[in-house]
C-alpha cells in the first residue's frame, strides 16, 4: 500500500516551470497614432470639440506609441453608432463581438506557440485563458479548446476582468500547475480586444480619453511546463518565483466597471507615482533571497501601462535607459494591450537576443524581473531565469 506522501511526491515535477514556446497575434487593422486623433474625433462625431481634440492630440503625441492594432474598423463602428457615443447603451453589441473575437484571436497566438513547441496538441494538459474583454458562459477557455481541437479532458481555468496586471497572474498560476503536476504542459493565452472600452470623448472624463489614446488589441500564448524533454523541447525562460501584492493607499487608483455602456475605465492621476514609490519593496522581497540588489544587473519586462509609469520607474530605480528597451518597443509598436503586453515583451526580448547573438535569452544576463501593474493597484512580480542561446 502506498502512502499519501509517496503519491504526492510522484505527482510533482522536479525542475522549475519553464516557458517552452511563445506565440503572438493581432487583428489585421493597423492604426497609426499620428493619424488617430483626426480619425477618432471624426468617427465619434466629435469634431466640434476642438479644445478636447487638441488635448487628445497631445496625449497621443506624448504616448510614445507609433501604431496600434484594433478589431474595430470604421465599417464596424458605422454599423454600431452607440459604440461611438460617450454613454449610450451598447453592452450587447460589444459582447456579441468579443465573445467571438477574443477566442479567435487567442487561437491565432496559440497555434503559433504550439507550432514552435513542436509537440502534438494532445499533450496539452491545462489551459489558462485570460481576458478583460467581455464575459460569457461557457467561457473563452471552452471556445478556445473547441477551436484548437484540444482533448475534452483538458483542465481549464478562465480568468475574466483582471486587467493589466494579469500577464503576471497567468505566469504565477501556470507555474503552480506545471510544478505540481508531473508532465503537465500548460497552454496560457491572454487575448484582449478594445471593443469593450472604445467610446466617444467627454470633457469631464479625461481618464477615459487616456484609455482611448493608449489601448490596443493583441493576443499572446505560451506553453509552460517543468522538466523540458531534452532535444525535443527548447526552454526560453524559467519561472523562479511569483508574488502578488496590493499597494498601500491605492484604493480606486485604477478601476474598471462593466455597465450598459460597456467597460468604463477610471484612472487616478498619480498611478505612476504610486507604482514607482512602491516598486523597490517588491524587488527587495523577490531578489534579497537570491543575494541580488543591483537592479541594473537584471533584465526587465514591465507592463507598459503608459510612458509616465516607465519614466518614473526608470528614474526611481536609476535604471539605465536600455533596461526598458524591450518594454518601450512593445508599447511603441502595439500600445497597451492589457494582460498580453508582458508576454509580447518576453517574445521581443528572446527574439532580439538571438538576433544580436547574445549568450542568453535575457539580454545576455542571468536573472530578470517581470512586473504586471493593474486595478487595485495590484502588482505581480515574477522572477525569471534566462536560458543560454
UniProtKB/Swiss-Prot annotation:
It catalyses: (E)-4-coumaroyl-CoA + 3 malonyl-CoA + 3 H(+) = 2',4,4',6'-tetrahydroxychalcone + 3 CO2 + 4 CoA. Pathway: Secondary metabolite biosynthesis; flavonoid biosynthesis. It holds the Pfam family Chal_sti_synt_N. GO terms for molecular function: naringenin-chalcone synthase activity. The keyword Cell membrane does not apply. Its EC number is 2.3.1.74. It is found in: Cytoplasm. Keywords: Acyltransferase, Cytoplasm, Flavonoid biosynthesis, Transferase. The active site is at 164. GO terms for cellular component: cytoplasm. InterPro entries: Chalcone/stilbene_synt_C, Chalcone/stilbene_synt_N, Chalcone/stilbene_synthase_AS, Polyketide_synthase_type-III, Thiolase-like. GO terms for biological process: flavonoid biosynthetic process; polyketide biosynthetic process. SUPFAM superfamilies: Thiolase-like. Involved in the biosynthesis of prenylated phenolics natural products which contribute to the bitter taste of beer and display broad biological activities. Chalcone synthase that can use 4-coumaroyl-CoA to produce 4,2',4',6'-tetrahydroxychalcone (also termed naringenin-chalcone or chalcone) which can, under specific conditions, spontaneously isomerize into naringenin. Belongs to the thiolase-like superfamily. Chalcone/stilbene synthases family. This is Chalcone synthase H3. It comes from Humulus lupulus. The gene is chs_H1-211.
Amino acid at each position: 500500500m502506498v502512502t499519501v506522501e509517496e503519491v504526492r511526491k510522484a505527482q510533482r515535477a522536479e525542475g522549475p516551470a519553464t516557458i517552452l514556446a511563445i506565440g503572438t497575434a493581432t487583428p489585421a487593422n493597423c492604426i497609426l497614432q499620428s493619424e488617430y486623433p483626426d480619425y477618432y474625433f471624426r468617427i465619434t462625431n466629435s469634431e466640434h470639440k476642438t479644445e478636447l481634440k487638441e488635448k487628445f492630440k497631445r496625449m497621443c503625441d506624448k504616448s510614445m506609441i507609433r501604431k496600434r492594432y484594433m478589431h474595430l474598423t470604421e465599417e464596424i463602428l458605422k454599423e454600431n453608432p452607440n459604440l461611438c457615443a460617450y454613454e449610450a447603451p451598447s453592452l450587447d453589441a460589444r459582447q456579441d463581438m468579443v465573445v467571438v473575437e477574443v477566442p479567435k484571436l487567442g487561437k491565432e497566438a496559440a497555434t503559433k506557440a504550439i507550432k514552435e513547441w513542436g509537440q502534438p496538441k494532445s499533450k496539452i494538459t491545462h489551459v489558462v485563458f485570460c481576458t478583460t474583454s467581455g464575459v460569457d458562459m461557457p467561457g473563452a477557455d471552452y471556445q478556445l479548446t473547441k477551436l484548437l481541437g484540444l482533448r475534452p479532458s483538458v483542465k481549464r481555468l478562465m480568468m475574466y476582468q483582471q486587467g493589466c496586471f494579469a500577464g503576471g497572474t497567468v505566469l504565477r498560476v501556470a507555474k503552480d500547475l506545471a510544478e505540481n503536476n508531473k508532465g503537465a504542459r500548460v497552454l496560457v493565452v491572454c487575448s484582449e480586444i478594445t471593443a469593450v472600452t472604445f467610446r466617444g470623448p467627454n470633457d469631464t472624463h479625461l481618464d477615459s480619453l487616456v484609455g482611448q489614446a493608449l489601448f490596443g488589441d493583441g493576443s499572446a500564448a505560451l506553453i509552460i511546463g517543468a522538466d523540458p524533454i531534452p532535444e525535443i523541447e527548447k526552454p526560453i525562460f524559467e519561472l523562479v518565483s511569483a508574488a502578488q501584492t496590493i499597494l498601500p493607499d491605492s484604493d480606486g487608483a485604477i478601476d474598471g466597471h462593466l455597465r450598459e455602456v460597456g467597460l468604463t475605465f477610471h484612472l487616478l492621476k498619480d498611478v505612476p507615482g504610486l507604482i514607482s514609490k512602491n516598486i523597490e519593496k517588491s524587488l527587495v522581497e523577490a531578489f534579497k533571497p537570491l543575494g541580488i540588489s543591483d537592479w541594473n544587473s537584471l533584465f526587465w519586462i514591465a507592463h507598459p501601462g503608459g510612458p509616465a509609469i516607465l519614466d518614473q520607474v526608470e528614474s526611481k530605480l536609476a535604471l539605465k535607459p536600455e533596461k526598458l528597451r524591450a518594454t518601450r518597443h512593445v508599447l511603441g509598436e502595439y500600445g497597451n494591450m492589457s494582460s498580453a503586453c508582458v508576454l509580447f515583451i518576453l517574445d521581443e526580448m528572446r527574439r532580439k537576443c538571438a538576433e544580436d547573438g547574445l549568450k542568453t535569452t535575457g539580454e545576455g544576463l542571468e536573472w530578470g524581473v517581470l512586473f504586471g501593474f493593474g486595478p487595485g493597484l495590484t502588482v505581480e512580480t515574477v522572477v525569471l531565469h534566462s536560458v543560454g542561446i
